[in-house]
């Protein structure tokens, strides 16, 4: 979460099980006016001419995407990390959301001791709609190159900037889906949804050599790309969390995890220039103020030094 009401929420295998899950749900006005910018990335890895889809997603009327079959491990040690294995090639993906911004940064690394011709294609699954609303199929989305490695994607009401060390390839706009949201169907919510794809980011590399990481930064602000950008954003997040832990002054590992877990629900409230608490993700909004109705639920925030 980003402390504004925005969030990045995918399943352990990197799929969407609910329509309100998103790779980047931005907060237009903290914390309740939220925009669903990008649902996910369609990730395709090509090795020596053979394509492998790394994305996982249940679909309604077509075969499911089963990238989880190549998923070797998932870990969450401060940030989520997915590791895929195809033959002797290992593809790792790390992701971080910047606190106080509508920014998600991803870093891919492709490694093998053997020589292979590899290509990674990342296709944004764009939604560009208010949270809880469907994608408007009549919406026109344009893609412009702002400068080297910085791209501007504009919809009817939204602008998304992508800074990446990858080449852009535009394609005819087409709908992706419908996707099947199994958890929503169980709860009686809308069980399907679509996104739109207009372009891809492509990076080609040869394994067995010194390799650069593939970095993709998705944001509502334009970042000038440089090779250390992902690390800067990661260190920014880590510094914020270290400050929280220092303030809480807890020594037990469980207590320190509680500090970071509780922080996910503390958000800015723009209308009062103060803080509020989100009742839960991805459905709920904030309680707006502290009162007797909700006070019994604040014990975790008292214990972690957030009150």
What do the PLM-derived regions correspond to, one by one?
Residues 93, 197-202, 275-291:
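Solvent-exposed loop and edge beta-strand segments that line ligand/cofactor-binding
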Residues 282-307:
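Alpha-helical support elements that line or immediately flank enzyme active sites
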């Amino acid at each position: 979460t980003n402390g504004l009401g925005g969030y990045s929420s995918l399943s352990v295998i990197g799929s969407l099980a609910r329509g309100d899950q998103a790779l980047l749900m931005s907060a237009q006005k903290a914390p309740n006016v939220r925009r669903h910018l990008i649902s996910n990335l369609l990730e395709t890895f090509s090795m020596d001419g053979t394509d492998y889809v790394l994305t996982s997603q249940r679909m309604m009327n077509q075969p499911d995407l089963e990238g989880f079959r190549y998923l070797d491990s998932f870990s969450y040690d401060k940030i989520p990390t997915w590791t895929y294995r195809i033959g002797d090639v290992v593809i790792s993906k790390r992701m971080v959301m910047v606190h106080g911004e509508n920014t998600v940064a991803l870093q891919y690394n492709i490694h093998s001791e053997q020589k292979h011709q590899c290509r990674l294609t990342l296709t944004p699954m764009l939604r560009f709609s208010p949270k809880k609303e469907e994608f408007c199929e009549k919406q026109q989305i344009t893609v412009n190159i702002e400068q080297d490695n910085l791209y501007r994607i504009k919809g009817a009401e939204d602008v998304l900037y992508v800074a990446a060390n990858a080449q852009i390839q535009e394609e005819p706009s087409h709908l992706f889906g419908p996707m099947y949201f199994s958890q929503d169907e169980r709860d009686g919510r809308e069980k399907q949804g679509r996104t739109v794809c207009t372009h891809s980011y492509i990076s080609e590399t040869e394994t067995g050599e010194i390799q650069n990481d593939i970095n993709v930064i998705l944001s509502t602000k334009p970042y000038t790309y440089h090779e250390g950008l992902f690390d800067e954003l990661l260190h920014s997040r880590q510094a914020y969390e270290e400050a929280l832990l220092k303030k809480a002054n807890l020594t037990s590992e469980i207590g320190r995890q509680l500090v970071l877990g509780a922080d996910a629900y503390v958000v800015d409230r723009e209308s009062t220039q103060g803080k509020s608490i989100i009742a839960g993700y991805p459905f709920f909004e904030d309680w707006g103020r502290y009162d007797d109705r909700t006070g019994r639920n604040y014990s975790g925030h008292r214990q972690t030094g957030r009150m």
